[in-house]
A protein has these predicted regions:
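Feature for extracytoplasmic/surface-facing segments of secreted or surface-associated proteins
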Residues: 24-186
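Short amphipathic alpha-helical segments, especially helix-boundary/capping motifs
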Residues: 13, 126-155, 379-383, 406-407, ...
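N-terminal hydrophobic or amphipathic segments with adjacent small-residue motifs
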Residues: 3-6, 12, 53, 328, ...
């Protein structure tokens, strides 16, 4: 459909030109538009036609069919664009070149695209509200031949020209308010009323998307769920093994006690990336639900990511798998329970390691009493750590090796490398989400009695050093409110380099090197100790005192901040009361972030401060259906000590935006209203669609769903129903990959019982292959540009 529209527009333009000069369409001059709003004064040269000039008031430039056009401001090359590229947008029927096209990337918020936009706007002294900008006044200041390939380069070029770079916050606002081909998008709902058992056993959609274009036309596109591959597929791996088969540090497949390979039923995060013109897909596998005998394997098996090389149909955009191979984690001590993830603005994959092992449970600490307590046995930390070490072949691995951010970089040709970063703290990280400066990120901490952290890297797209902060919730809404609202203040936990923290872990740092623990159990802590409560599935109350001195040359307080982030945050007075803090997302145009809370319970309820409840910052009504929160980002903020936070993207207000609603169980076992979200988990915001996508992980909906929340209208619609008991995972939206958009969506652990009524469960369970889980996407969308 998109190609037909595009072709029609181009043919119409050619026919009009041909009527005017009598020449053939192949040799007729065509007009394109350079758009970051409309950009005047940029020099261009087209080859092979030889056409040259400067862009006009509305960004116009001339070219012939088949030309590649190069754009410059002074001596600085912005990029070159093949005008035959089907991914280019349209402006009133004319092909439109955007900063992402000049940068050779597919995403408007990619760091390279932002760098090109920042340079253009700096040269034009642009304001976010400007609809036309002019670089001609400053073009002569850029006399040296150079290119724009990074944000750092923009700073260097601007300084040399005597200009101040436009802030990235303003760059994003201006860039995303600039003209695009798509004016608005609206999804229609998938109605599950009276849905057949057969359709409740699969990924099911009847939704459409109505796209309104800037030329006044509208098109409606039906959605369909497209399977890329299953976890158990054997046809695309080099050795014929299952796609998700688990391997040890030597690359050998790990077998269960029955001699059959461990194959997880839990595909999670996806990062669909364009690398040198080839699409690749990184996929997480979170945990092994069960082995071949049905024995629970959660957390006791090393986990995996795969890298799939894809091909894309040039006609309908359909993706297909060429090959699948494992990502090698042997150089970083293996991979522990990877949950959600994100594609970084610099086109790498940023993963997670959820439910990090409690280092106080480890035998090296020598705290047998604690190791035998429910804080350790409730999550089986000791059993999991020992099983992981044995199966992966990392006998001496420290608990502090896990709970990290693994970054996967894909090179041209498909080779992958992994770096685990120790600078973003150690927590039950659901997902790390970077903002427009490629330095600032927020992180959700999944579990009960958890916290919200902010990371600010020293340098853009470089995670080797940075500062970590934890949030304090200062409630504005009344006690017992539904969802609630609060101002956020930020407590600095510390600054560190990756090398510092990793060296201490390699040197054998233990929990007891960081903290003293008083176990006398009095109603109040003894002098010098602070009572804190933190946890995952099991909340732990501890009386802690930070040790003094250094370990491996690193101050103990710094190590505590980056090795025991949640404990240390609680010790410093941050709010450690959030409940199942899940996915996060970023809206660049509005400078907002979003965060999912599976439920508001336990620490988030209004409660009395007692010996077992040391804090009551969050005082909300209990809600088992959860909510999505909106966080307003601001520049010029200070931490709790009065020191400036070096970021223009600091969350300062947090309030409930989309809230679920509990109900009495219906005949199927649904315990949350079916027209509202239940237990939100995965989040992703599409800049061009202006839609926040919400994936569920709920026992309160028999069939979890993927929802589309239209942020401008507030309309919420279900666009995908998942198999009974399955969790919606792998959520990522790519607005434009070579002329097509994709909503990546997987599901895991289909057939789980949860709250499903027994009769309903018995009817549907037999229709589901519980060993199978799908990696796929919602297809049928045109490019959103």
């Amino acid at each position: 459909m998109r190609i037909k529209v595009l072709t029609t527009a181009i043919i119409s333009s050619l026919l009009l030109t041909a009527c005017n000069d009598g020449s053939s369409s192949a040799s007729s001059t065509q007009t394109g538009v350079l758009s970051d709003s409309y950009v005047k004064g940029v020099a261009y040269s087209a080859a092979p036609s030889g056409k040259t000039g400067a862009t006009g008031t509305n960004g116009e430039f001339d070219y012939l069919a088949g030309d590649t056009v190069t754009f410059k401001i002074g001596g600085v090359t912005l990029g070159s664009v093949n005008m035959s590229n089907t991914a280019l947008g349209l402006d009133s029927g004319r092909l439109m070149v955007r900063p992402k096209d000049l940068a050779g990337v597919v995403d408007e918020t990619d760091e390279k695209a932002l760098a090109v936009a920042q340079f253009i706007q700096t040269a034009a002294a642009a304001l976010p509200s400007d609809t036309r900008i002019d670089v001609s006044g400053n073009a002569g200041k850029f006399t040296t031949a150079d290119t724009v390939d990074s944000l750092d380069k923009v700073g260097t070029l601007a300084t040399a020209a005597g200009l101040s770079p436009v802030s990235l916050e303003k760059v994003s606002q201006h860039l995303l308010n600039a003209p695009g081909n798509v004016k608005s998008v609206e999804f229609t709902p998938t109605d599950i009323t009276g849905l057949s058992d057969a359709n409740r056993a699969l990924a099911y959609t009847t939704s459409t998307v109505k796209v309104a274009y800037t030329d006044g036309s509208t098109k409606t596109f039906p959605l369909s769920y497209v399977n890329l591959f299953n976890n158990i597929d054997t046809g695309k791996t080099a050795d014929g093994s299952a796609a998700a088969a688990i391997r040890d540090k030597n690359g050998h497949i790990i077998n269960d006690p029955a001699g059959k390979p461990y194959v997880p039923q839990t595909p999670d995060a996806n990062s669909l990336m364009d690398v040198g013109g080839t699409p690749y897909l990184v996929t997480h596998y979170e945990y092994v639900s069960k082995d071949s005998a049905g024995t629970d394997g959660y957390g006791k098996v090393p986990m995996a990511m795969t890298l799939a090389k894809l091909s894309q149909s040039k006609t309908d955009g359909k993706l297909a798998v060429d090959s699948i191979k494992p990502v090698d984690f042997s150089g970083v001590n293996g991979l522990w329970i990877p949950c959600a993830g994100s594609r970084s603005p610099w086109n790498t994959h940023l993963g997670s390691e959820e439910y990090e092992p409690d280092a106080r449970c480890d035998a090296s600490v020598g705290d047998a009493t604690y190791a035998a307590s429910s804080s350790c046995t409730g999550m089986e930390y000791t059993a999991r750590m020992n099983a992981f070490r044995a199966l992966y072949g990392e006998a001496t691995a420290s608990p502090y090796n896990y709970g990290r951010v693994p970054e996967v970089t894909i090179a041209m040709g498909g080779a992958s490398t992994v770096q685990k970063w120790y600078t973003l703290g150690r927590l039950s990280r659901e997902k790390v989400q970077f903002f427009g400066d490629s330095r600032t990120a927020i992180q959700g901490d999944d579990g009960t009695y958890t916290h919200l952290t902010l990371f600010v890297a020293d340098k853009a797209r470089n995670l080797s050093a940075g500062t970590l902060y934890a949030a304090k919730w200062n409630q504005l809404s009344s006690d017992g409110a539904e969802g609630g609202k609060a101002n956020l203040t930020w407590i600095k936990l510390g600054h560190a380099t990756h090398g510092q923290i990793k060296a201490a872990v390699d040197a054998g740092v233990k929990f007891s090197d960081l903290f003293a623990v008083d176990t006398s159990g009095g109603a109040t802590p003894v002098a010098g100790f602070t009572r804190v409560k933190h946890g995952h599935e099991v909340a732990t109350v501890e009386d802690l005192k930070l040790n003094t001195g250094t370990f491996a040359g690193v101050p103990i307080d710094t190590l505590a901040a980056f090795l025991e982030t949640c404990r240390y945050a609680a010790l410093k007075g941050a709010t450690v009361e959030f409940e199942k803090f899940e996915g996060v997302a970023y809206n660049a145009r509005d400078n907002k972030a979003y965060a999912a809370m599976t439920r508001m319970a336990n620490g988030m309820e209004n409660k009395s401060v007692t010996s077992t409840e040391p804090a009551n910052d969050i005082r909300l009504k209990k809600n088992g259906s959860g909510a999505v929160y909106q966080l307003s980002l601001q520049p010029g903020w200070f931490d709790s000590a009065g020191t400036a936070i070096d970021s223009a993207f600091v969350p300062v207000v947090m309030e409930a935006l989309v809230v679920g609603e509990d109900m009495a169980a219906d005949t199927d076992g649904n315990k949350s209203r079916l027209d509202k979200i239940a237990s939100p988990d995965n989040l992703f915001f599409s800049e061009r669609m202006r839609v926040l996508f919400i994936g569920e992980d709920s026992g309160n909906h028999v069939n979890n769903a993927l929802w589309a929340y239209h942020v401008d209208s507030g309309k919420l619609v279900r666009i995908l129903s998942l198999p009974m008991g399955a969790e919606s995972t792998g959520l990522q939206v790519v607005d434009n990959l070579n002329g097509h958009a994709y909503i990546m969506s997987n599901y895991q652990h289909a057939g789980d019982k949860n709250s499903t009524a027994q009769a309903t469960f018995d009817r549907i369970k037999g229709l589901i292959n519980t060993d199978k889980a799908e990696v796929g996407y919602l297809g049928g969308l045109p490019a959103m540009r």
